[in-house]
Amino acid sequence: MGDSGDPFLRNPNAAVQARAKVQNRANVLQLKLMGQSHPTGLTNNLLKLFEPRPPLEYKPPPEKRKCPPYTGMAQFVSNFAEPGDPEYAPPKPEVELPSQKRERIHKLRLEKGVEKAAEDLKKYDPNNDPNATGDPYKTLFVSRLNYESSESKIKREFESYGPIKRVHLVTDQLTNKPKGYAFIEYMHTRDMKAAYKQADGQKIDGRRVLVDVERGRTVPNWRPRRLGGGLGTSRVGGGEEIVGEQQPQGRTSQSEEPSRPREEREKSREKGKERERSRELSHEQPRERSRDRPREDKHHRDRDQGGRDRDRDSRRDRDRTRDRGDRDRRDRDRGRDRTSRDHDRDRSRKKERDYEGGEYEHEGGGRSRERDAEYRGEPEETRGYYEDDQGDTDRYSHRYDKMEEDDFRYEREYKRSKRSESREYVR
């Protein structure tokens, strides 16, 4: 029921009396039957949801049968292996480690390389090589070349030592790619020797080359590095034992003869380094003596050289007076700037005090001495800025601790002003 006096008129028919709903006869009978069927008044469909489950079916208990007893393992102990039996400690299987596998493969490759070198050595004959033409004593061997270097580039680099007859850049027969070494034939033997001495270690296309003479046709019993040999006796290839067997033990190898210029060059380099070291030591010795010499000796030496110290002190005094003059000049410039600013400020204040009624005359008579001096533009020395410093002043007293100890001591003993004698400086 709504309120009859509701201002919003939410239920305008609130004043009308409610009428009871007319119930049919069938509904009334149905309600009676429901009440008679179950005390809760629920329908049959709802009552089926609350019906209990049927009871469990009865099963008789199982019959108890006799089980066999538990037995131990004592009867099987005799079947175990004893310490003397081979099955007691079986041997561990041998497994190859990765490092051992790599070492085995490396050894196999070395053996194959030695076999191949022995086979190629039988076929090796540099004197009958169709590619090796020209005079062997005028031919220079250049190795460790850049793979992108061309014959024209190599010729341009080595032409500085003399005219070149031919440049042969060795390439692979199958791929036609350069192998990194070449042979240069000069017109004269002296040019080849000059290039052999000076071109070793030269940089060509970013790589330092190795220069040597042609040893295949000039040195007997010599073999290239691919066949187990190398560059004379200074470098030994992979087949070191083979090289030792071929060389006779009673005499030295003939390949040592062309390497003499290189040894001489190394000796000359060592001599040059020794000269440089001796020069450095000669320059350092007087400094070390001056450091190691005690201070008393230096004091006696300075007494003997009094004239030099006086000249040095006079030069320092002149420098100080110049610095003092520059500083005074800067102070005067600052004082003039302050004077102009204060003068303008005083003029403005004077006008204000004139308006106030003559107070300026009373206060103006007591102006400070510094203000008058600034107005007249006098330097600060006359105004008493340095009135404490009378006589010969030492304006660098705060820097004595930053100077060298010896120089400061003798300078102070030589000349002191009255002002510095009255002060106590920290030594």
Curated annotation (Swiss-Prot):
Ubiquitous. It holds the Pfam family RRM_1. Phosphorylated. The association and dissociation with SR45 is not affected by the phosphorylation status. Residues 138-216 form the RRM domain. Residues 93-102, 257-402, 409-427 have a biased composition (Basic and acidic residues). The modification Phosphoserine is found at residue 282. Component of the spliceosome. Interacts with CYP63, U2AF35A, U2AF35B, SRZ21, RSZ22, SR34, SR45, SR45A and SCL33. Mediates the splicing of pre-mRNA by binding to the loop I region of U1-snRNA. This is U1 small nuclear ribonucleoprotein 70 kDa. The lineage of its organism: Eukaryota, Viridiplantae, Streptophyta, Embryophyta, Tracheophyta.
